[in-house]
Amino acid sequence: MEGWQRAFVLHSRPWSETSLMLDVFTEESGRVRLVAKGARSKRSNLKGALQPFTPLLLRYSGRGEVKTLRSAEAVSLALPLSGITLYSGLYINELLSRVLEYETRFSELFFDYLNCIQALAGTTGSPEPALRRFELALLGHLGYGVNFTHCAGSGERVDDTMTYRYREEKGFFASVVIDNNTFTGRHLKALEEREFPDVDTLRASKRFTRMALKPYLGGKPLKSRELFRQFMPKRTVKMKKD
């Protein structure tokens, strides 16, 4: 694609002595694999720009699976993610790299991604609400439509006080058994409205998105989750010392 378009680097790795292999998420072309020739050389002005969470304008060309980066400019400084928000950002980057096919346009998802990392950069509390909203948006763009407002068995509106069991590709059915696959009507309302007023609804939304994303991720664990688990004990110890 010869024209300029907005983009973010999801992941990069060394490619030859002076180049980088980039996995980027673009507004118009979706996920694209690019070679940035000479980007690792000492004289390259791209080195600082081709970092995750830096808003970019870029141009590339090529007809094969791997394109060639022609130009790239940082629109602004990288969004300030650190600590838990940095690990959260790495998680959504890895999520996109795992579930999106190359060169499939997801323009609306691009702005959902931008909104998510902006929310992470601006949060002073838990990153969980921003992550859950992004996961739900991603599922919607992947065609994973779920009706949170009506019981799939009876067609009636869900009741806040009742319990519902989730069945993949079918929806929620009233249930008298409570286990890890069931949700209250109150949980479903929170999922529908993308609002999580307490820890209980946040935990329920996390259970649901993990269940729903599992078919797309397969059995291979996410590296960012493991990094997050390693980070959390250190963070807990530091908070206790403080």
Swiss-Prot record:
<protein>
    <recommendedName>
        <fullName>DNA repair protein RecO</fullName>
    </recommendedName>
</protein>
<keyword id="KW-0234">DNA repair</keyword>
<dbReference type="InterPro" id="IPR037278">
    <property type="entry name" value="ARFGAP/RecO"/>
</dbReference>
<dbReference type="GO" id="GO:0006310">
    <property type="term" value="P:DNA recombination"/>
</dbReference>
<dbReference type="InterPro" id="IPR022572">
    <property type="entry name" value="DNA_rep/recomb_RecO_N"/>
</dbReference>
<dbReference type="GO" id="GO:0006302">
    <property type="term" value="P:double-strand break repair"/>
</dbReference>
<keyword id="KW-0233">DNA recombination</keyword>
<dbReference type="InterPro" id="IPR003717">
    <property type="entry name" value="RecO"/>
</dbReference>
<keyword id="KW-0227">DNA damage</keyword>
<dbReference type="Pfam" id="PF11967">
    <property type="entry name" value="RecO_N"/>
</dbReference>
<dbReference type="GO" id="GO:0043590">
    <property type="term" value="C:bacterial nucleoid"/>
</dbReference>
<comment type="similarity">
    <text>Belongs to the RecO family.</text>
</comment>
<dbReference type="Pfam" id="PF02565">
    <property type="entry name" value="RecO_C"/>
</dbReference>
<dbReference type="InterPro" id="IPR012340">
    <property type="entry name" value="NA-bd_OB-fold"/>
</dbReference>
<comment type="subunit">
    <text>Monomer.</text>
</comment>
<dbReference type="InterPro" id="IPR042242">
    <property type="entry name" value="RecO_C"/>
</dbReference>
<comment type="function">
    <text>Involved in DNA repair and RecF pathway recombination.</text>
</comment>
